[in-house]
Curated annotation (Swiss-Prot):
Zn(2+) binds at residues 901, 904, 921, 924. Gene3D superfamilies: 1.10.730.20, HUPs, Valyl/Leucyl/Isoleucyl-tRNA synthetase, editing domain. A motif ('HIGH' region) lies at residues 58-68. Its main location: cytoplasm. It comes from Citrobacter koseri (strain ATCC BAA-895 / CDC 4225-83 / SGSC4696). Its EC number is 6.1.1.5. Its cofactor is Zn(2+). ATP binds at residue 605. Catalyzes the attachment of isoleucine to tRNA(Ile). As IleRS can inadvertently accommodate and process structurally similar amino acids such as valine, to avoid such errors it has two additional distinct tRNA(Ile)-dependent editing activities. One activity is designated as 'pretransfer' editing and involves the hydrolysis of activated Val-AMP. The other activity is designated 'posttransfer' editing and involves deacylation of mischarged Val-tRNA(Ile). GO terms for molecular function: aminoacyl-tRNA deacylase activity; ATP binding; isoleucine-tRNA ligase activity; tRNA binding; zinc ion binding. IleRS has two distinct active sites: one for aminoacylation and one for editing. The misactivated valine is translocated from the active site to the editing site, which sterically excludes the correctly activated isoleucine. The single editing site contains two valyl binding pockets, one specific for each substrate (Val-AMP or Val-tRNA(Ile)). This is Isoleucine--tRNA ligase. It is found in: Cytoplasm.
């Protein structure tokens, strides 16, 4: 028997079947670095329209986690897809380098500033530590396949950036948004510093819940308001609180002007509380017998005075919109030094903003004899005992509730009035302008707009000062006596900024005021405060984007971070940009959800359900991690587990196998010499290119809309359905058995070439390593990297007016599916071993029959059978099976006639008819020794 294997055009490629990504990717990365791939892309894109995704800086502390990976991969997908869409999209990664977490790490090793090291040496240690953290994180980000200017990232501790942060504050001061005041701010007694809203987390805490009686200073005045002539015992206004320690700072009791308040007689005393809460309060107090003596609106009780239960003064009843009926008594204990609502209402009524608590959380001397020097969280029991002793405690119980805590220490925090510097939301219309700017931004998902609007509408003034060592100095001088800013404050800040640009923030601490103040140095002192780190990152639109040459003065198009950043970076950036420039710093804001495990639980080391990106890359490769990110809907929680990553790896294999099939069958194809013009191609090949064109239209729209999971789904559908289960199956016969240089085969290769050129680009933003690998195996001259080009423009499709248009082939797909069902049943019944052992008769209604007949003898190639006939539906044989999908079709199957050709595996009656090739069929003889078969349709 002759061996005809050498006469076949068998697929051949060096592109490996197995990705082996964990081993192969590092070598590709080394090549990208050696070649300066990022620089090559920038050069190729120079002069194109820009798209700037400004990197929100991660904090330079600790290893990257799965959330970091999601964030950086999403950014990289966007930057790469924008590049392919014809944009110049530079990506400058950044790091947030100042602040308390770094201070705490350095303290743990070296002690607090002033112990073993001077403050200057301590700052140097902080800078060193941050630099090492940046290096560690950078390696992992690069390993993810993220392309960017990793050699020149921006760091908030770069001298120039530090200087520009000071300049940003100067601009805000110049625009009139800064003010100083003693305001209640989130205060961590462990940090001994004010906290930003974004540094506050909420945890459950058990606190005493108490009802306290404030006796009326003038009982007759109260009785007159309620229209009663006598009561049994003293009259008291009842407040409810879960923070007894704040009672020394009480300066008023707030009522709602429109609520009804009742005067309730119980045994031996009369109590004032909201009428709607009387029943619940009486149950709490255990008062079964009570009488409502009268009711009045809260507004009627305004400015009546009540005696503080243990301090030696009276406090007024005042009116506020913050009073609710959700819990308590409808009368709110008001301490302007310990709460933002209390402060606002206190300002309205001219109340003292009392703060009896020191920075360490202990009461200051002179607060109250039994409280002086006591930590506030240990004082609750003392205050409760004091109230009981004074006869003012009506009820006490334990209550578990959500309580604000420091995100670093996980310990409860307090509101504490301290002298701080604030960016005012209202004194120059910052709130109003910010809300206006929000409407001009595209929020993705769109619910982000309502979220940040609500936050801006309700947020307090932004406390930007901190009492820390490692941070950008506020660089202000204030008068020794009046504490007013120096009249040349902005000019002086520029002088400081110039010095910081040369020597870093230490230049401020080393500065002798006389050097820039001259004679004024005797009257003015340096403000020791540093800036909130959210000011550092929030001003990068000015300190980085506005000054980096690659951004060429363009504002950022997009900010992209986790959904917690509405109150973090998105907020601080919006506040600073609007205060500086009157406009938002971004055009689009995209947020992604948090990562959870396969059961939807939050990632936690204690549960043991964390997924390490380093482990995933070392085991499966970065492209699998990237494919998981892209295939997950980032608008909600993003579930990840070993099983979910295994599914991503399965999807990857399907895509890789498709690419390998394309490359293997392009063996020997030169696009310059062998390309077949569209009009001369086999119709099925043109259809396949049209499928790629339709897929590309969908994929490009999905990239444009940042719907990456849609990109992956469409890519998978193309590989699995249109290619894998139809086209690639059909063309194997023609590709392998036709004459190597025939139009029939070159037409097929031309289609595969067009498809591969498009496919590799669709993959590039997501599976970057694999796309780069494929690119190296594609035939023809090309740029060195797929990332420097644009979406493939060589695709085309069938004309709608053609007889064999897309609709025609869609129907053929259905027919083939119905034929496959019959063949599968015959295989199960052992009637045939494979589809080429079968011949089918298609009994079809006239319209469908005409479509099938149009293919002539090539119908069998579409159906992957050795024989195929078309007959009248009405003449269907008894064994013909009715199609469930196509009512006008019945399919009958029989064993194919003739012998199996060992070369093409088709069964045919002309095997051995040519003496020189007595073992093979006539078609194969023609393809080996003759002119070769002609294909027109399939």
């Amino acid at each position: 028997m002759s061996d005809y294997k050498s006469t076949l055009n068998l697929p051949e490629t060096g592109f490996p079947m197995r990705g082996d990504l964990a081993k192969r990717e590092p070598g590709m990365l080394a090549r990208w670095t050696d070649d300066d791939l990022y620089g090559i892309i920038r050069a190729a894109k120079k002069g194109k329209k820009t798209f700037i995704l400004h990197d929100g800086p991660p904090y330079a502390n600790g290893s990257i986690h799965i959330g970091h990976s999601v964030n950086k991969i999403l950014k990289d997908i966007i930057v790469k897809s924008k590049g392919l869409a014809g944009f110049d999209s530079p990506y400058v990664p950044g790091w947030d380098c100042h602040g308390l977490p770094i201070e705490l790490k350095v303290e743990q090793e070296y002690g607090k500033p002033g112990e073993k090291f001077t403050a200057a040496e301590f700052r140097a240690k902080c800078r060193e530590y941050a630099a090492t953290q940046v290096d560690g994180q950078r390696k992992d980000f690069i390993r993810l396949g993220v392309l960017g200017d990793w050699s020149h990232p921006y760091l908030t501790m770069d001298f120039k950036t530090e200087a520009n942060i000071i300049r940003a504050l100067g601009k805000i001061i110049g625009n009139g948004h800064l003010h100083k005041g003693a305001k209640p701010v989130h205060w961590c007694v462990d940090c001994r510093s004010a906290l930003a809203e974004a540094e506050v987390e909420y945890y459950d805490k058990t606190s005493p819940s108490i009802d306290v009686a404030f006796h009326a200073a003038d009982q007759d005045a109260v009785k007159a308001k309620f229209g009663v002539s006598s009561v049994n015992g003293p009259i008291s206004l009842v407040i409810w609180t879960t923070t007894p320690w704040t009672l020394p700072a009480n300066r008023a009791i707030s009522l709602a002007p429109d609520f009804d308040y009742a005067l309730v007689q119980i045994d031996g005393q009369a109590l004032i509380l909201a009428k709607d809460l009387v029943e619940s309060v009486m149950q709490r107090l255990g008062a079964a017998d009570y009488t409502i003596l009268g009711t009045v609106k809260g507004a009627e009780l305004e400015l009546l005075r009540f005696t503080h239960p243990f301090m030696d003064f009276d406090v007024p009843a005042i009116l506020g919109d913050h009073v609710t009926l959700d819990a308590g008594t409808g009368a709110v204990h008001t301490a302007p030094g310990h709460g933002p609502d209390d402060y606002v209402i206190g300002q309205k009524y001219g109340l003292e903003t009392a703060n009896p608590v020191g920075p360490d959380g202990a009461y200051l001397p002179g607060t109250y004899p039994t409280l002086d020097g006591v930590n506030v969280f240990k004082a609750n029991d003392i205050v409760v005992a004091l109230l009981r002793e004074k006869g003012a405690l009506l009820h006490v119980e334990k209550l578990q509730h959500s309580y604000p805590c420091c995100w670093r220490h996980k310990t409860p925090i307090i509101f504490r009035a301290t002298p701080q510097w604030f960016v005012s939301m209202d004194q120059k219309g910052l709130r109003e302008q910010s809300l206006k700017e929000i409407k001009g931004v595209q929020w993705i998902p769109d619910w982000g707009q309502a979220r940040i609007e609500s936050m801006v509408a309700n947020r307090p003034d932004w406390c930007i000062s901190r009492q820390r060592t490692w941070g950008v100095p506020m660089s202000l001088f204030v008068h020794k006596d009046t504490e007013e800013l120096h009249p040349r404050a902005i000019e002086l800040m520029e002088e400081v900024a110039k010095r910081v640009e040369v020597d870093g923030i230490q230049a401020w601490w080393d500065l002798d005021p006389k050097e820039i103040l001259g004679d004024d140095a005797d009257q003015y002192v340096k403000v020791p405060d540093t800036l909130d780190v959210w000011f550092d990152s929030g001003s990068t639109h000015a300190s980085v984007v506005d000054v980096r040459p690659e951004f060429a003065g363009h504002a950022a198009d997009m900010y992209l971070e986790g959904s917690d950043q509405h109150r973090g970076w998105f907020m601080s950036s919006l506040m600073i940009s609007t205060a500086m420039k009157g406009k938002a710093p971004y055009r689009q804001v995209l947020t992604h959800g948090f990562t959870v495990d396969g059961q939807g639980r939050k990632m936690s080391k204690s549960i043991g359900n964390t997924v390490s990106p380093q482990d995933v890359m070392n085991k499966l490769g970065a492209d699998i991690l990237r494919l998981w990110v892209a295939s997950t809907d980032y608008t909600g929680e993003m579930a990840v587990s070993d099983e979910i990553l295994k599914r991503a790896a399965d999807s990857y294999r399907r895509i890789r196998n498709t690419a390998r099939f394309l490359l293997a069958n392009l063996n020997g194809f030169d696009p310059v010499k062998d390309m077949v013009k569209p009009e001369e191609m086999v119709v099925l090949d043109r259809w396949a290119v049209g499928c790629a064109k339709a897929a590309q239209d969908d994929i490009l729209k999905a990239y444009e809309a940042y719907d990456f999971h849609e990109v992956v789904q469409r890519l998978m559908r193309f590989c699995s359905v249109e290619m894998g289960s139809f086209y690639l199956d059909i063309i194997k016969d023609r590709q392998y058995t036709a004459k190597a240089d025939s139009v029939a085969r070159r037409s097929c290769q031309s289609a595969l070439y067009h498809i591969a050129e498009a496919l590799v680009r669709w993959m590039a933003p997501i599976m970057s390593f694999t796309a780069d690998e494929i690119w190296g195996y594609l035939p023809g001259d090309r740029e060195k990297y797929v990332f420097t080009g644009e979406w493939y423009e060589g695709l085309f499709g069938l004309g709608e007016t053609e007889a064999m248009n897309d609709a025609y082939w869609d129907e053929l797909l259905k027919v083939r599916g119905e034929v496959n069902k019959v063949i599968e049943q015959a295989r199960a019944d052992k009637k045939v071993g494979g589809s080429l052992e079968a011949a089918v008769t298609l009994y079809a209604e006239p319209e469908l029959a005409a479509k099938l007949t149009a293919l002539g003898d090539e119908l069998r190639f579409v159906l992957l059978t050795s024989g195929a006939k078309v007959a009248d539906y009405a003449e269907a044989s008894a064994d013909a099976q009715q199609s469930e999908l196509l009512k006008g079709l019945k399919v009958a199957l029989s064993k194919a006639e003739g012998e199996k050709c060992p070369r093409c595996w088709h069964y045919t009656t002309d095997v051995g008819k040519v003496a020189e090739h007595a073992e093979i069929c006539g078609r194969c003889v023609s393809n080996i020794a003759g002119d070769g078969e002609k294909r027109k349709f399939a």
